[in-house]
């Protein structure tokens, strides 16, 4: 007889093989065609809001793994909050202005940006940006990320640009915007100023040089010293030889000691603490100190520039340290922030002997026309020939590079527009402390950055961006910016976009009758610079959160990579504090970078770049989503094919658990078949308690944004509590009991609860799989169209806190673990095959023996053995003996029983199976 026909074997359309890459698009279609995201919002529209404001990715290429990690983490936050009942509108955004797009368009059109019509050029830039928004939009949707994809925000949107102009106007009105000559990061390749957030540091090997500046006016300090006719030189040290044409001073520290060192034919001045190191580096063996002065004594000593007809004044500065060099700092106010500031105090004028493209100007004398990098060698040769080069040293140091073109940048003093951070620094620091930073070290990171940061250079010498809305009087050159002009321009931009600045005449951009407040002239010129793109994205909170009715300012969360402490987190904070006095966010959550399997940075040159679509097309988006939580995302995340393959195994275990549950619920309708708690079998009560513990821990982990903990909790529950224990134990009563028996319905009742809860718990992370499970649940108490339209599972506190139940089952599982080891030994010795082939005898001391006897049927069921005996022992340790089971094997349930075959029809089944078969 085919006994399988009499068993309740699992039935489900939920496939064992996931085939995610092929199946996921079906669910994307389902979500889109059924407006699931819209219905999620509708379901919670009257509830408390949770607003995550999207940091806009740059619209200039396919998405990379960093983008994928970022968007998936945001999606997890939003989906969890929505399932908890929060109203969670999510507006994706794009950063669309700036240098990278300009460069791509220049390359594509093969044009010179200085010669091209700006309006036509901007049109091409816009087309380029929009084309990549469409590409990235589809790529983000393929990840399973929910959002208002057809209604995103873009920094090129006319209304966005208008709001940005108003933010600028508000800051100007408060006196935070000014124009000044200051050294800024300058990219000669891109011919524009850069902000700190646009700088990347790379390790460079270079030469540092020691240069002698001859003292020509010692203020009489050295007149009584035994110097004779020997010349005195102050020795400076620099790693940027090309800046020497800009030298106007030598800075000393007022409190340091400086030694005059006789080296035989001349006298050198260096910081006393550094004498030995300087002499050793420059291979000077014979020397002696002849005098010592405080730095403040040497103030206003004059030196002769080594190759230009100019003097260099000795000045004092607190920035001078003894960490490297000579303690005498080469000072070129046109090439350094500290140099500039210290020279300002001495009224030393600024010269900048380097042009926009990085070539030395006539102020560099004979080196004019050389590219700054090429001048290093030529200047060093000149110094050596004239006897001013004391020595050369090869060093490795971190040097700033342009984040866009990757070329080295220079410090160069130019006229730029700045936002004065000084004016609201204290407010910004207070705002930092009002925010929750995850991880906590983020607070110190951004706090220290704001403490130390200089004023924000917001002007760029480019075309594709939002113009700085300022005019200049043609007569007296006074800047014009008023509430009236800002409002007028903003209204034009609202209708026509910022292209209007480039296409319209000045008079069309100004209200009628506007005159210069200084000289009364009515003729004006437009500012030609545009705003830093960080001002664009940094203003997004003002446009997105305030202009959409369903959002609110401030938002609940910003979530980006940890490079954004000096980028978007900071630019948003500064514009918000400057205009509103507080941060635009309540929580800031950060993640690390994506690196390869060995922890190395990904780069095309290394050949170790993995595209998100390499993973999606082979393994599916859910595997990529699982990777996003498979490690601590607040640090750098490793990825490789091997790592992904390991994750597919973990995914398979979760999927198989769901499949087993689905397969055994094909005939269970919770509306009619559910068993009340008081009638549940004890093992089912225990499983329910384990489920509630899981829900409690997973909920806490989601609340704390600890998604790696969610991953481990769910995986362990599926493998340890379910597959290895509860579901394995349940197979007999699920398959072999009467289909409608209390025994089977009890198991199904709890398995149904487990399936529903587990599906919802994984939905924020494994969104496609959770939806697939949900659609395969035949009968549901709550017939929600999608898993995302249901509610977060609740907990019965009484069951969860039932300590007697927990303690009892801890003991039972401890006994099972001991017995399982002995069964494994017996299996290896070929004494038994399946555990049902065995009879187990347990030897235990009195109290444990009594416990086993009182719960013998339960323990035998948990052990999955055919027979169980227990005997008393004096030992504190439980001893287990395994024997072949008594009786014959039931052909239906495979348990051994001495009563097999002893029935009216002489069927080779046990009494339980006979009763079931007979009833059918």
Swiss-Prot record:
Reaction catalysis annotation: tRNA(Ile) + L-isoleucine + ATP = L-isoleucyl-tRNA(Ile) + AMP + diphosphate
CDD domains: Anticodon_Ia_Ile_BEm, IleRS_core
Pfam families, per database record: Anticodon_1 (PF08264), tRNA-synt_1 (PF00133), zf-FPG_IleRS (PF06827)
Residue window of motif 'HIGH' region: 57-67
Record GO cellular component, one term: cytosol
GO MF: aminoacyl-tRNA deacylase activity; ATP binding; isoleucine-tRNA ligase activity; tRNA binding; zinc ion binding
InterPro entries on file: aa-tRNA-synth_I_CS, aa-tRNA-synth_Ia, Anticodon_Ile_BEm, Ile-tRNA-ligase, Ile-tRNA-ligase_type1, Ile-tRNA_ligase, M/V/L/I-tRNA-synth_anticd-bd, Rossmann-like_a/b/a_fold
Chain location of the short sequence motif 'KMSKS' region per the record: 601-605
Keywords, comma-separated and alphabetical: Aminoacyl-tRNA synthetase, ATP-binding, Cytoplasm, Ligase, Metal-binding, Nucleotide-binding, Protein biosynthesis, Zinc
Enzyme Commission number: 6.1.1.5
Ligand binding (ATP): 604
Residues the entry annotates as binding L-isoleucyl-5'-AMP: 560
Cofactor note: Binds 1 zinc ion per subunit.
Subcellular location, record wording: Cytoplasm
Cofactor field: Zn(2+)
Residues annotated as binding Zn(2+): 890, 893, 910, 913
A GO BP annotation: isoleucyl-tRNA aminoacylation
Enzyme class, UniProt record, top EC level: ligase
Function: Catalyzes the attachment of isoleucine to tRNA(Ile). As IleRS can inadvertently accommodate and process structurally similar amino acids such as valine, to avoid such errors it has two additional distinct tRNA(Ile)-dependent editing activities. One activity is designated as 'pretransfer' editing and involves the hydrolysis of activated Val-AMP. The other activity is designated 'posttransfer' editing and involves deacylation of mischarged Val-tRNA(Ile).
HAMAP family: Ile_tRNA_synth_type1
Quaternary organization: Monomer.
Similarity field: Belongs to the class-I aminoacyl-tRNA synthetase family. IleS type 1 subfamily.
Comment field on protein domains: IleRS has two distinct active sites: one for aminoacylation and one for editing. The misactivated valine is translocated from the active site to the editing site, which sterically excludes the correctly activated isoleucine. The single editing site contains two valyl binding pockets, one specific for each substrate (Val-AMP or Val-tRNA(Ile)).
Record protein name field: Isoleucine--tRNA ligase
Species annotation: Caldicellulosiruptor bescii (strain ATCC BAA-1888 / DSM 6725 / KCTC 15123 / Z-1320)
């Amino acid at each position: 007889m085919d006994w399988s026909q009499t068993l309740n074997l699992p039935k489900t359309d939920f496939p064992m093989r996931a085939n995610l890459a092929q199946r996921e698009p079906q669910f994307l279609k389902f979500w889109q065609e059924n407006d699931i995201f819209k219905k999620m919002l509708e379901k919670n529209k009257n509830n408390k809001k949770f607003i995550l404001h999207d940091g806009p990715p740059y619209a200039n290429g396919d998405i990379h793994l960093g983008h994928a990690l970022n968007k998936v983490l945001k999606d997890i936050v939003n989906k969890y909050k929505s399932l908890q009942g929060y109203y969670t509108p999510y507006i994706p955004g794009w950063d669309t202005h700036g240098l990278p797009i300009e460069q791509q368009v220049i390359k594509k059109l093969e044009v010179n940006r200085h010669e091209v019509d700006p309006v036509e050029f901007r049109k091409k830039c816009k087309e380029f940006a929009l084309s990549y928004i469409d590409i990235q939009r589809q790529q983000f949707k393929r990840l399973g990320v929910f959002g208002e994809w057809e209604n995103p925000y873009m920094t090129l949107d006319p209304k966005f640009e208008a709001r940005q102009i108003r933010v600028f106007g508000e800051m100007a009105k408060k006196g935070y915007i000014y124009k000044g000559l200051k050294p800024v990061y300058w990219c000669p390749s891109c011919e524009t100023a850069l902000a700190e957030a646009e700088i990347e540091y790379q390790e460079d090997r270079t030469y540092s040089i020691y240069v002698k500046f001859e003292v020509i006016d010692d203020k009489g300090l050295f007149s009584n010293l035994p110097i004779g006719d020997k010349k005195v030189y102050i020795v400076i040290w620099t790693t940027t030889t090309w800046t020497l044409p800009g030298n106007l001073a030598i800075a000393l520290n007022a409190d340091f000691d400086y030694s005059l060192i006789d080296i035989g034919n001349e006298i050198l001045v260096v910081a006393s603490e550094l004498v030995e190191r300087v002499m050793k580096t420059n291979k000077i063996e014979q020397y002696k100190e002849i005098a010592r002065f405080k730095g403040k004594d040497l103030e206003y000593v004059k030196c002769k520039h080594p190759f230009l007809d100019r003097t260099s004044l000795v000045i004092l500065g607190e920035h001078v340290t003894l960490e490297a060099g000579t303690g005498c700092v080469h000072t070129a106010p046109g090439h350094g922030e500290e140099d500039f500031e210290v020279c300002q105090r001495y009224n030393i004028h600024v010269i900048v002997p380097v042009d926009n493209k990085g070539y030395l100007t006539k102020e560099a004398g004979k080196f004019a026309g050389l590219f700054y990098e090429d001048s290093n060698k030529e200047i060093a040769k000149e110094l050596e020939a004239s006897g001013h080069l004391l020595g050369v040293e090869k060093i490795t140091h971190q040097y700033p590079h342009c984040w866009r073109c990757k070329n080295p940048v220079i410090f160069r003093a130019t006229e730029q527009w700045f936002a004065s951070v000084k004016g609201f620094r204290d407010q910004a620091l207070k705002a930092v402390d009002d925010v929750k930073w995850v991880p906590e070290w983020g607070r110190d990171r951004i706090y220290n950055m704001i403490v130390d940061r200089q004023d924000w250079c917001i002007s760029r010498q480019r075309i594709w961006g939002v113009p700085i809305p300022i005019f200049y009087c043609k007569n007296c050159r006074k800047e014009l910016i008023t509430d009236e002009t800002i409002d007028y321009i903003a209204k034009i931009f609202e209708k026509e976009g910022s292209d209007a600045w480039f296409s319209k005449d000045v008079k069309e951009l100004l209200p009628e009758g506007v005159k210069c407040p200084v000289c009364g002239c009515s003729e004006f010129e437009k500012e030609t610079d545009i705003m830093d793109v960080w001002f664009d994205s940094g203003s997004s909170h003002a446009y997105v959160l305030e202009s959409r009715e369903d959002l609110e300012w401030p938002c609940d969360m910003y979530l980006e990579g940890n490079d954004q402490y000096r980028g978007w987190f900071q630019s948003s904070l500064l514009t918000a504090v400057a205009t509103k006095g507080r941060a635009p966010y309540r929580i800031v959550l950060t993640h690390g970078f994506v690196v390869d399997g060995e922890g190395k940075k990904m780069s095309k040159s290394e050949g170790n770049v993995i595209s998100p679509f390499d993973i999606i097309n082979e393994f599916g988006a859910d595997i990529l989503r699982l990777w996003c939580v498979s490690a601590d995302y607040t640090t750098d995340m490793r990825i490789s094919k091997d790592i992904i393959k390991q994750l597919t195994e973990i995914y398979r275990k979760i999927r198989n658990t769901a499949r087993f549950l689905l397969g055994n619920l094909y005939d269970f309708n919770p509306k009619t078949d559910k068993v009340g708690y008081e009638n549940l079998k004890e093992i089912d009560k225990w499983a329910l308690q384990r489920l509630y513990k899981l829900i409690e821990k997973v909920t806490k982990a989601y609340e704390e944004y600890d998604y790696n903990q969610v991953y481990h909790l769910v995986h362990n529950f599926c493998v340890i509590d379910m597959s290895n224990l509860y579901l394995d134990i349940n197979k007999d009563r699920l398959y072999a009991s009467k289909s409608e028996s209390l025994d089977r319905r009890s198991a199904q009742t709890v398995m149904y609860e487990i399936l529903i809860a587990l599906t919802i718990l994984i939905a924020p992370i494994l969104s496609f799989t959770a939806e697939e499970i949900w659609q395969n649940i035949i009968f549901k108490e709550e017939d929600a169209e999608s898993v995302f339209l249901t509610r977060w599972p609740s907990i019965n506190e009484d069951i969860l806190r039932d300590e007697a139940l927990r303690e009892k089952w801890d003991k039972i599982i401890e006994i099972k673990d001991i017995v399982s080891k002995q069964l494994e030994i017996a299996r290896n010795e070929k004494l038994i095959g399946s555990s049902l082939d065995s009879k187990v005898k347990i030897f235990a001391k009195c109290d444990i023996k009594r416990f086993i006897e009182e719960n013998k049927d339960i323990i035998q069921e948990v052990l999955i053995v055919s027979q169980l005996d227990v005997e008393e022992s004096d030992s504190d340790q439980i001893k287990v003996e395994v024997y072949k089971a008594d009786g014959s094997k039931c052909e239906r349930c495979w348990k051994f029983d001495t009563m097999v075959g002893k029935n009216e029809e002489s069927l080779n089944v046990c009494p339980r199976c006979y009763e079931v078969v007979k009833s059918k």
